[in-house]
């Protein structure tokens, strides 16, 4: 009996070791549809860093290009053919890639949507709360405007799920301030050059406005005011390193940064690994709630000072990790290296 027990224990140990070895051979696919954007670049680096830090991922297969839902459908199907165990996707829109997601999950592939939601029920969603992101910033802005006047509404990419959700949040805040009106509404495409040209054109037109809400393309908006000598108005942006620095350094600027961590990509990889390890969460939707850091209150100034990081690209969010989800170091995300690189 004693010998049998020892044999069983040894067998259990071998089975356990085999399980660990198998866990270290996960292949994870990544699908992203926007390049040339600092937020998305940080997201990709967070995915790589988390995969490396986990010690459980053998390789990443990354489809990272500028495309639409049709192109992303093709990318996801290619990842399915490549034999990945999981796919982490930042969707082009909420329902445009549902068919490919369903094809993946029908084959037992775990699918996690990050940053913005999808409507396919077989997918897991780990997203920044985009509606609340817009609401917090817009409400603060309208209060700074004294509850009246004209706001410039600088949105993201037309048709993107995150932009649609942010529009709901912005309009929810707008409904609370009937004396605030939208002077101009533009889509920046989340591209810095495009947004800067748009605000320069608006400034040059000479139409008065009292505030600017941006969907995260922010530091170049401040640059446009400073370079043109235009009097500053309150500006809302995201927690991008450049804008966070400006909120502490640009004289006369009143503004607020709303957190929207690109590191949600790393959290999505962590969730995919957790599910592959047999530890799927009870709920398929996880929202990361934003926080507002303003430079008009002592508490806000302290938060901005603590978050500032001059070592990051100006376009990268300073929230480079998400407590309870990501496990990599600052050096690892900045290095932007995944398994085998």
Model regions and ranges:
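Short, solvent-exposed amphipathic alpha-helices that sit
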Residues: 39-53, 133-137, 161-180, 198
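Flexible loop/hinge segments that line or gate small-molecule binding clefts
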Residues: 94-132, 150, 241-254
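Hydrophobic alpha-helical
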Residues: 77, 85-105, 170, 188-247, ...
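Sec/Tat signal peptide C-region and signal peptidase I cleavage site
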Residues: 17-23
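Short beta-strand elements in bilobed, periplasmic/extracellular small-molecule ligand-binding domains
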Residues: 51-65, 150-153, 174-192
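Extracytoplasmic "Venus flytrap"
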Residues: 27-50, 54, 60-74, 84, ...
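Hinge/cleft segment of the Venus flytrap/periplasmic-binding protein
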Residues: 25-26, 173, 271-341
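Hydrophobic alpha-helical segments within soluble ligand-binding/sensing domains
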Residues: 28, 72, 126-151, 165, ...
């Amino acid at each position: 009996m004693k010998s049998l027990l020892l044999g069983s224990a040894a067998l259990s140990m071998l089975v356990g070791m085999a399980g660990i070895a198998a866990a270290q051979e996960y292949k994870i696919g990544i699908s992203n549809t926007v390049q040339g954007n600092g937020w998305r670049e940080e997201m990709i680096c967070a995915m790589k860093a988390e995969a490396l830090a986990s010690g459980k991922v053998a390789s990443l297969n990354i489809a990272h290009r500028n495309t639409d839902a049709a192109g992303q459908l093709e990318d996801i199907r290619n990842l399915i053919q490549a034999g990945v165990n999981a796919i982490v996707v930042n969707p082009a829109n909420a329902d445009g890639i549902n068919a490919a997601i369903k094809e993946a999950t029908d084959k037992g592939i775990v699918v996690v949507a990050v940053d913005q939601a999808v409507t396919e029920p077989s997918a897991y969603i780990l997203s920044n709360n985009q509606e609340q992101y817009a609401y917090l910033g817009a409400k603060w802005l309208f209060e700074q405007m004294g509850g009246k006047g004209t706001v410039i509404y600088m949105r993201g990419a037309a048709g993107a799920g995150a932009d649609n959700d942010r529009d709901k949040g912005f309009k929810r805040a707008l409904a609370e301030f009937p004396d605030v009106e939208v002077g101009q509404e533009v889509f920046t495409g989340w591209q810095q050059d495009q947004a800067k040209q748009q605000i320069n054109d608006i400034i040059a037109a000479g139409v008065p406005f009292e505030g600017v809400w941006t969907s995260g393309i922010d530091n170049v908006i401040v640059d446009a005011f400073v370079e043109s000598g235009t009097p500053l108005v309150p500006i809302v942006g995201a927690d991008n390193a450049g804008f966070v620095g400006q909120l502490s350094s640009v004289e006369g600027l009143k503004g607020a940064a709303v957190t929207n961590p690109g590191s949600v990509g790393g959290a999505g990889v962590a969730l995919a690994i957790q599910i592959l390890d047999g530890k799927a969460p009870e709920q398929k939707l996880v929202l990361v709630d934003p926080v507002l850091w303003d430079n008009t209150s002592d508490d806000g100034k302290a938060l901005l000072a603590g978050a500032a990081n001059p070592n990051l690209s100006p376009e990268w969010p300073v929230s480079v990790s998400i407590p309870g989800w990501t496990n990599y170091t600052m050096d690892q995300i900045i290095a932007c290296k995944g398994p085998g690189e």
